[in-house]
Structure formats: C-alpha cells, structure tokens
Amino acid sequence: MRPLLCALAGLALLCAVGALADGREDRGSPGDTGERPAGPARGPGLEPARGTLQPRPRPPRKRWLLSPGAGAQQLEVVHLPGSTL
C-alpha cells in the first residue's frame, strides 16, 4: 500500500512540475470560479442560536495521544488561563 501511495504522490508532483514548466496554471475543476457562495457560513458553532445574535457554543475538541504502550487514548483539550488557542 505504501509504494502505491508514494507512486501516486510522485505522479502528482511530476504533473505539477510539468504544468509549471509549460507555463500552465492549475485552475481547478472546469466549473470552479474560485469564488465563495454569497450565503452565510454553515456548520456547528457558526449559526446564531435561536433568539440571540450570539453563536452557539462549540462542543469541546478532542485530541488523540498515541503512545507505544497504551495504544491510542482520546483526551479532552483543556484550555489554560492566558492561553490563546
């Protein structure tokens, strides 16, 4: 599986280098104009809660900690005072 992924990544890199050498530019899909839709952004925490103009609180994020002995552990992100994240 790994050699296949490496081959695909190499092929994509060669295509990109070839396009640069030819002076062409990757313009995305044929129907893509590169503009964002005019509507409001959607997703959890981006829509105002009913009856207010404040966004809904987002659920806490979780990070995965990988350690050789314990396997994968899911830990809750704790925000410390003064933290900017």
Swiss-Prot record:
Q: What is its main location?
A: secreted
Q: Which interval of the chain is the signal sequence?
A: 1-21
State where the protein is found.
Answer: Secreted
The segment annotated Disordered runs over 22-85
| UniProt KW keywords | Secreted, Signal
Keyword hit for Secreted: yes
Low complexity bias spans: 36-51
Organism domain of life: Eukaryota
The reply to whether Secreted figures as a keyword in the UniProt entry is: yes
> What segments bear the compositional bias annotation Basic and acidic residues?
22-35
Gene Ontology CC, one term: extracellular region
Q: What is this protein called?
A: Putative uncharacterized protein ENSP00000380674
